[in-house]
C-alpha cells in the first residue's frame, strides 16, 4: 500500500492587477506570476477544467498523453503500476512536477522522480505544461520543462457535487466535493474513490490485476487584503 500526504501552508503575494481585471487565459508556470498566455514566449500548454472534466480518462498521466504532443508517457502495466513522463525526449529526471506551487518531485532521489500512477484528475482545476529548459526559474531538474497542477478552488456560495462513472472490468469512480466562497475566504474539499477488478498485464494469464485508489484534496484560502492571500493545502493519496 502506498500512502502519500502533502500539506502546504504559505503566503502568496499577488499583484493588485490580478484582481482588477479578468484575463481569459492566464498562465503562472512561465514566469511564476499570473500573465496572459499570449504574452508568454515559452512553449506552454494549459489543460483547463472543462477538458479535465470531459475527458474519458481518469488519471492525469493518461490525459496528458492524449492531449499533448512532444511528451512520452510510459507505464509498466495496468492501473497503479509505475509510470512517468518525459518531455521533448529528455529523461524523466529533467521534468519537475509541482502541485499548487509546491515541488512534488522527490528531490531525495537521483532521478528527481514523480510517478503519475496514482494521480486522479477529479480534484484538479487545470494543468500547465511548460516545455523547454526552465533551469533559471525551477532549477536543474527542469531542463526539459515543468508540469504544474492546480487544485480546484471554492466557487461563490456553498456547493455540493457528486459524479459517478462506471466502465468495463468492474471499473467505477466516485467523485464527491464540497466547496464555497464567501467574503474573503474560500474552501474546497474533494474525495475520489476509484476501483477496478482489472485485467492481467501478462498474455495468456487469467489472473486479474485489481486496483483501488482513494484520494482527498482540501484547500482553504483567505484574502488578507488586495495584495496578500493565505492558502492552506492538503493532498492525501492511498
Predicted regions and their residues:
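N-terminal periplasmic accessory domains that precede
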Residues: 60-64, 83-86, 95-98, 114-120, ...
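Boundary at the C-terminal end of the N-terminal hydrophobic targeting segment
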Residues: 18-20
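Transmembrane beta-barrel outer-membrane domains
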Residues: 78, 117, 122, 140, ...
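N-terminal periplasmic "start-of-domain" segments of outer-membrane beta-barrel proteins
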Residues: 25-55, 84, 92
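Periplasmic-side early beta-strands and strand-to-turn transitions of outer-membrane beta-barrels
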Residues: 136, 148, 156-157, 165, ...
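Short acidic/polar hinge/loop motifs at secondary-structure boundaries
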Residues: 103-131
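Extracytoplasmic beta-strand/coil segments of soluble accessory domains associated
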Residues: 61, 65-103, 125
